[in-house]
Amino acid sequence: MTIMRKTHPLMKMVNHAFIDLPTPPNISGWWNFGSLLGLCLIIQILTGLFLSMHYTPDTLTAFSSVAHICRDVNYGWLIRYMHANGASLFFICLYFHIGRGIYYGSYMYKETWNIGIVLLFLVMATAFMGYVLPWGQMSFWGATVITNLLSAIPYIGSDLVEWIWGGFSVDKATLNRFFAFHFILPFIIAAMAMVHLLFLHETGSNNPLGIPSDSDKIPFHPYYSYKDLLGGAALLAFFFTIVLFFPDALGDPDNYTPANPLNTPPHIKPEWYFLFAYAILRSIPNKLGGVIALVLSILVLALFPFLHTSNQRSLTFRPISQTLFWILVSDLFILTWIGGQPVEPPFIIIGQIASILYFTIILILFPIAGMIENKMLKW
């Protein structure tokens, strides 16, 4: 008799994806972040569901409903801080996951990579709308500034902004629709993640050497299922350390002040995970130019498969490209720091140099380095 997991229509799908899946024998800890992102998404959906039971999407009561959750609801403070810091954890895993993809050439699986870029945009949109919901000062002014960027779109810009706002400013209608979208998007993300996996399983996973491993595969379970459990345990240990000991370390103190349209905070800035893109946006003195640079800072990821000039897939044996990769990582740290600083010298010029370097490394230096390395290896 055949084992049920191999015959039952539903079990068969799970079996092919998580049990008998042929996996390269040498994938490292950097391959753990996909499953960790799944764990983050589950945490966010569950905590978000319980928060939504007590939250009211109304300008008059939103702020106090969050305070009520923290003060009066059983373990409400824990659910709220898990949700807020879960977003940060989500982006930490996301950036590691993308970095792994760039380093090891996983972007050569074009369909999987492009779905991943769509997922990144969806997660960014969800996080932005979620940040507006507590209706603190930074929520209100962040929503005002970021939605206002759409007014830079020629001809339809102003109408588009008012259409998104549902009025002539960020108000009750905006908060209400942001809550609706913030609730539905994680389920769309979950569906897209399944498509992401579907495309990945068409080709199989890449590995640190960047060479085919079809002749030497091992089953996902028990090897990688236990490895993922260990990764998940480590992630949860780190997560609860932040949530229980430093719950406000990653947030903005301004968001503990209720939203006031008559009082602008001295420094309007997004959450830390958007600061690199915010710095690129601010580094261009023209509004439309800044918006284009902002979108391109993420869309440029889609060009990686086309800019790949090396005859080797991964950076494992490519020292010049490795150096460029780590300069790019350092550059992103600099951009993140600049995004949180006021717009004044010397931060303006540092931000502009870092922004130029970001695009130069990806669009020009990576392809050149690949060609130089081919020449050095006489390929």
Curated annotation (Swiss-Prot):
Heme 1 (or BL or b562) is low-potential and absorbs at about 562 nm, and heme 2 (or BH or b566) is high-potential and absorbs at about 566 nm. The keyword Transmembrane applies. Belongs to the cytochrome b family. Heme b b562 binds at residues 83, 182. It holds the Pfam family Cytochrom_B_C. One of its GO terms (cellular component) is mitochondrial inner membrane. The chain crosses the membrane at residues 33-53, 77-98, 113-133, 178-198, 226-246, 288-308, 320-340, 347-367. The cytochrome bc1 complex contains 11 subunits: 3 respiratory subunits (MT-CYB, CYC1 and UQCRFS1), 2 core proteins (UQCRC1 and UQCRC2) and 6 low-molecular weight proteins (UQCRH/QCR6, UQCRB/QCR7, UQCRQ/QCR8, UQCR10/QCR9, UQCR11/QCR10 and a cleavage product of UQCRFS1). This cytochrome bc1 complex then forms a dimer. GO terms for molecular function: metal ion binding; ubiquinol-cytochrome-c reductase activity. Gene3D superfamilies: Cytochrome Bc1 Complex, Chain C. InterPro entries: Cyt_b/b6_C, Cyt_b/b6_C_sf, Cyt_b/b6_N, Cytb/b6-like_sf, Cytochrome_b, Cytochrome_b_C_euk/bac, Cytochrome_b_N_euk/bac, Di-haem_cyt_TM. Its cofactor is heme b. This is Cytochrome b. Component of the ubiquinol-cytochrome c reductase complex (complex III or cytochrome b-c1 complex) that is part of the mitochondrial respiratory chain. The b-c1 complex mediates electron transfer from ubiquinol to cytochrome c. Contributes to the generation of a proton gradient across the mitochondrial membrane that is then used for ATP synthesis. Keywords: Electron transport, Heme, Iron, Membrane, Metal-binding, Mitochondrion, Mitochondrion inner membrane, Respiratory chain, Transmembrane, Transmembrane helix, Transport, Ubiquinone. It is a multi-pass membrane protein. One of its GO terms (biological process) is mitochondrial electron transport, ubiquinol to cytochrome c. Heme b b566 binds at residues 97, 196. It is found in: Mitochondrion inner membrane. It comes from Perognathus longimembris (Little pocket mouse). A ubiquinone binds at residue 201. Binds 2 heme b groups non-covalently. It comes from the Eukaryota.
